[in-house]
Each structure stands twice: as C-alpha cells, then as structure tokens.
C-alpha cells in the first residue's frame, strides 16, 4: 500500500446517486487502522461472516447522522443487510483481523476482530475520519465516522486515520438528511460502491457541479471553503462572480443542469458573505447587484430546464427587490411571462408582458408576444362561446 493512499465511497440516497467521497488515509500515523479501512474499501479480504463472501463497505448504510457533528457507517454485520431491523444496525462490526473461529465462538457480541487504538488526537477540523468503538479502549472494528464540525469531546478517545479531500458537499448532503429522534436517516443512505481511488477516476457529483471551468475552485458550501476569511468581502465577491461566470460558460454549452448548480452556488456565497450596509456599504451594493444578475440567470436556466414554477419564483424574487433597474425588471417580467405562458396561465403571462413593455418600450419582440397571447385568449373565449352554445342548442 502506498504512502497516504486514497480511497473512495460512492453515495446514493434512496437508490439515487449523489456523488463520490474521496478520503486520504494516514498510513504512517495509524497503520493498522488504515490497512483495515483500505481493505474494506477494496473489498478483497475473504469474510468470516456466513452471509458475505468478502468484507466490504459496498452496500453498507449510514445508520447515524448528527447535524453539526458527524455521519457514521460501517456496521458490515447488520448495516449491509436490507432486512436488518433499525434496532440492530449500529450494534455490529467486523474488521479484516477477525477470523471464522472468533465469529463462530463469540455468541454474545456482534463486533469481531477488534483492534487497538492509534493516533488518539484532537478532532479540530471537519471532514476528519475517525473509528467508532464500543465505548472503551481498543475496540475498533469496521464502524467509522466523518466529522462535520470540530468535536473536542472526542479528543483522545477515537483513532484518527484520515480526512476527506474531495466530495465534501456529498458529506454535507448526508448530514442534511432528515433523521428520527435517534439520528437514524429517514432515507436509505448507502455506500453504493467503494474502492481504491486514482485521479483518472474523477469525482462524480450529481446534485452539484465540481467542474472548474472558468476558475471555480471553491467548495460547494461556503463554510467549507478556505480560500479567504469570513470578513474578506472583496475576495468573497470575487469568488461569487467567478462561480457565476462558470455557470454562464456551462449555460453557453447548453449544460443547463450544471449551470443551475453553479448559479445556485454563487447565490449561496452571496447570501453567506454579503456585509450589512453599515459594515461595508460599497460591497453591500456590489453584492446586491450581483444577486440581481443571479436571480435573472436562475430564472432563465430553470426555464430551459422546464422547471417553470421555479423560474417564476426567482423572477419574482428579483421583482420584489428595491432599486432594480428598469432593464432588469423588463427581463424578469419577460422570463416570468414566458413561464406563465408555458403553464397556459395566459392572463398572468399577458400582464407580465405588458409590464415588460412598460419597462422597455423599445422592445419589438415583446409587442409580438403581447399580440400572440391576446390572440390565444380570444381563441379560448371563442371556443368557450361555441361550447356554451352547443350546450343550449
């Protein structure tokens, strides 16, 4: 095994692919723990368990999720079986160091191949990999967790053996799943595949875009990004602009889904870092102007994705803002009107086209739209009149 090897976990939620988590393992600091996790990802160690040919995390579920703390998986005794009761999942585990004799003779515990602690350090950063245990020293097997926040109460109690290097947004997606009172996800969150990772394999992502086109090197969630500080409003504005332009490049390629993800991401950065006017008035205005552009872009890309209700929503967000330039208001009315038209809400479409004309009277295209919708409305009225006359004839 190479120094600090890389492994991956592909995640699905209710059988829908979400994305890939890539982890770097600390072989030198935690050699035995790393070997165990590496092999369980590779899935090439024969299993001492009756119902499994090889020990593997593949098919294993995340059985405990605590927001602002951690996500936990790795019970390959109960957590990989679809018919296991929720009360059983989380009570088992099996490391690569277990053998058939131990499994056969141990009829009290469902945790096999327990091994010693290593690298009992401090959990000061999110996305740290740690081994779950039985609440006492040297009881590691296969269960592991990924922190989503600093966890000082775990310091010195759990082996630290790696960190997430790619796919942090996938971890956040799991963290944000709805859970019951015991932290059990209401959805079926599973490791659909796993193994040893190489750069040529990429980092698939299905609910966001990690395409770096246009220079977008920023994390999906602003809190996870380390390129600038919380009060560096200039850098934050630059990042939000770069992300927006990345979306526009994708839009021009007609990659509407990923363009939407980029615009949504840019909006998240704007909402996270926009200063109050009394803190930095100039930057506040710049952020607001960028937010207007993002609302317009979101309305347009969602229209192209045939998500008309969402397109209407973002156009409305813009129209509810203060001091919106007439040209931008015209664009918002036009795009919202187009969405209303697609939904056959003709009266609302006509009203928005009229408002658009008021804000941009020189636009000849909008005049054609108004005539077209008026004609549709008259045709519908004529059909209604004919139907009524048939009813009484």
From Swiss-Prot:
It comes from Saccharomyces cerevisiae (strain ATCC 204508 / S288c). Residues 8-196 form the PPIase cyclophilin-type domain. PPIases accelerate the folding of proteins. It catalyzes the cis-trans isomerization of proline imidic peptide bonds in oligopeptides. Plays a major role in negative regulation of the heat shock transcription factor (HSF). InterPro entries: Cyclophilin-like_dom_sf, Cyclophilin-type_PPIase_CS, Cyclophilin-type_PPIase_dom, TPR-like_helical_dom_sf, TPR_rpt. TPR repeats lie at residues 240-273, 292-325, 330-363. Its EC number is 5.2.1.8. Keywords: Isomerase, Repeat, Rotamase, TPR repeat. Interacts with RPD3 and CNS1. GO terms for cellular component: cytoplasm; cytosol. The lineage of its organism: Eukaryota, Fungi, Dikarya, Ascomycota, Saccharomycotina. The gene is CPR7. It comes from the Eukaryota. SUPFAM superfamilies: Cyclophilin-like (SSF50891), TPR-like (SSF48452). One of its GO terms (molecular function) is cyclosporin A binding. It catalyses: [protein]-peptidylproline (omega=180) = [protein]-peptidylproline (omega=0). This is Peptidyl-prolyl cis-trans isomerase CYP7. GO terms for biological process: protein folding; protein refolding. It is an enzyme of class 5 (isomerase). SMART domains: TPR (SM00028). Present with 3230 molecules/cell in log phase SD medium.
């Amino acid at each position: 095994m190479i120094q600090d090897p890389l492994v991956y976990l592909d995640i699905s939620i209710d059988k829908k692919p979400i994305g890939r988590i890539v982890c770097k393992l600390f072989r030198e600091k935690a050699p035995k723990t790393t070997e165990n996790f590496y092999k369980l990802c590779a899935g090439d160690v024969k299993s001492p368990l009756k119902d499994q040919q090889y020990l593997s995390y593949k098919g294993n579920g995340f059985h405990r999720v605590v927001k602002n703390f951690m996500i936990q998986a790795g019970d390959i005794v109960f957590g990989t079986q679809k018919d296991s009761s929720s009360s059983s999942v989380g009570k088992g585990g099996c490391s690569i160091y277990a053998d058939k004799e131990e499994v056969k003779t141990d009829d009290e515990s469902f945790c096999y191949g327990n091994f010693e602690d290593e690298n009992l350090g401090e959990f000061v950063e999110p996305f740290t990999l740690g081994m779950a245990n039985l609440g006492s020293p040297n009881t590691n097997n296969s269960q592991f967790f990924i922190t989503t926040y600093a966890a000082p109460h775990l310091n010195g109690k759990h082996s630290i053996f790696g960190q997430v290097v790619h796919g942090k947004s996938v971890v956040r997606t799991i963290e944000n799943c709805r859970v019951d009172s015991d932290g059990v996800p209401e959805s079926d969150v599973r490791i659909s595949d796993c193994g040893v990772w190489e750069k040529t394999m990429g980092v698939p992502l299905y609910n966001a875009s990690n395409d770096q086109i246009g220079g977008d090197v920023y994390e999906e969630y602003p809190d996870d990004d380390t390129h600038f500080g919380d009060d560096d409003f200039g850098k934050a504005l630059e990042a939000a602009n770069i992300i927006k332009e990345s979306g526009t490049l994708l839009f021009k390629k007609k990659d509407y889904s990923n363009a939407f993800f980029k615009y949504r991401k840019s909006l998240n950065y704007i909402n996270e870092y926009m200063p109050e006017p009394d803190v930095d008035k100039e930057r506040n205005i710049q952020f607001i102007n960028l937010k207007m552009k993002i609302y317009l872009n979101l309305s347009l890309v969602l229209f192209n994705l045939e998500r008309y209700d969402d397109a209407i929503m973002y156009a409305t967000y813009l129209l509810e803002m203060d001091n919106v330039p007439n040209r931008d208001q015209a664009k918002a009315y036009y795009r919202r009107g187009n969405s209303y038209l697609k939904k056959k809400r003709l009266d609302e479409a006509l009203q928005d086209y009229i408002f658009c004309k008021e804000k941009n009277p020189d636009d000849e295209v909008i005049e054609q739209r108004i005539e077209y919708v008026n004609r549709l409305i008259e045709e519908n009225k004529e059909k209604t009149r004919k139907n009524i006359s048939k009813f009484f004839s």
